[in-house]
Amino acid sequence: MNDKTYCSSAFLMYRTIPDHSKQFQEGVSPKFFVPFSEPPTQVHDSFDLEDSLKKSVERACKKGKTAIALSGGIDSAILAKFMPKGSVAYTFKCVVPGIEVTDETIQAAKYAKECGLEHRIVEIYWEDFERYIPILIEHKGAPCHSIEVEIYKAGLQAVKDGHDTIIYGESSDIHYGGLSGLLSKDWTVGEFIDRYSYVKPYHALKEYQLVTEPITKYEENGWVNVHEFNRHELFVEAMGSYTNACETAGINVECPYARTWLADPIDLNRVRAGENKYIVRELFNRLYPGYVAPPKTPMPRPVDQWFKDWEGPKRPEFWPHCTKYMNGDQRYYVWVLEKFLDYLDTQK
C-alpha cells in the first residue's frame, strides 16, 4: 500500500517502516531483513554463547575468504578470538578535518594483535555520505541508517581485498541487555514512545502520523516489555542496515550474535546495577584475562560535526527551520529522508 505520510513518520520515529505492507510510492518497494530459516541457538550462560559464536565464525570462515569488522568494543573482540590467525580485521575511523572524534582503532589494534589478525583501517569522510547515500537508499527502497555508509565502504574494501564475507558483532546489545538506557527503568507506553522516537514526526513534517503500534503491541498492564521490543522490532531494523549495506557492496554478512537467543528472562536488576550484557562480559573476561572492558560506544559517526551548519530541509513536506534545535543524529534522519523523497521524484 502506498502511504508516504505513514512511511515518512515511521522512519523518523523508528528508522524503519514497521508495517512491511506499506511503501512510500508505487514502484519503489522497501527491502527488509529476512529472518533466518533456522531457529536461533538457545543461550543460558556464557558457555552456551561461546559455543554458538565459535561455530558460527568457523562456519563462515570455511572458505578462507572471510574478514571481520573489529571495533574497540567487546562484542567483536570476542568474535576475533575465533578467527583464523592471519585473517583481516577492518576498523572504521571517521575523519573530520581539524576536529578530534571518537577513535576506536587504538583499542581494536590491541585485540587484533592479541588474536594474530592483520589490522586495516577504513577511513570514513563526509564525502562518503554524499557519494554512497544515493546508492544505498536506491537499493533499500527507503531512507537508511547512517551506519550503512560505513558498513558499505568496508564491504567495498573487503571485496577489493578478495573477501566474500564479513563478520560483525551486531545484535549482542539487543539480545543480551546492552541497551542500558532503554532498559534503565520500567516505562509506561507514553513514556517509552517519547523516549524511543528518534524524531517526533510533528517536529519535522507538516503531514504526519504517530506510529505507536510497534511499541503498544509489547504493552503488559500499561508497561512496555522493552527487552521483547528490542529483540523483535529493533532487531529487524538493525539487521536490515547490515544486510542492505553488504548486499549493495556485493559481500555476504555474518552476524553470529543474531543467531542466538537469550533463553532465560533477562536480569534487569543486574543491567540496572551497571552490569549490562552480563553474559557477554563474562565471556569476554574469560577470553581476555587481564583486559579491562572499554566503555560501550556506538559505531563512530560524527554527525554533530557534519550537520552543525546544515540549514535544514527545503522540501514542502517539512516545516521551515524544523532542525534548528535538533542534535546531529536527528538532523541526519531528516536529511536522509529529504534525500529519499528527492529520489522518489525521479521515479514517478
Regions found by a protein language model. Give the residues of each.
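Mid-to-C-terminal catalytic subdomains of enzymes
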Residues: 171-189, 228-324
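Hydrophobic transmembrane helix bundles of membrane-integrated enzymes that assemble
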Residues: 26-38, 43-46, 52, 77-82, ...
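Short, flexible loop segments at boundaries between secondary-structure elements
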Residues: 187-215
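Phosphate/ATP-binding catalytic cores across multiple sugar-kinase/actin-like superfamilies
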Residues: 46-68, 157-163, 238, 342-343, ...
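A conserved beta-strand->alpha-helix junction
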Residues: 105-139, 170, 213
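RNA-binding accessory domains that recognize and position tRNA/RNA substrates
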Residues: 1-65
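ATP-dependent adenylation/pyrophosphate-handling site
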Residues: 59, 65-115, 120
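Acidic, carboxylate-rich catalytic segments that either coordinate divalent cations
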Residues: 2-7, 13, 165, 319-348
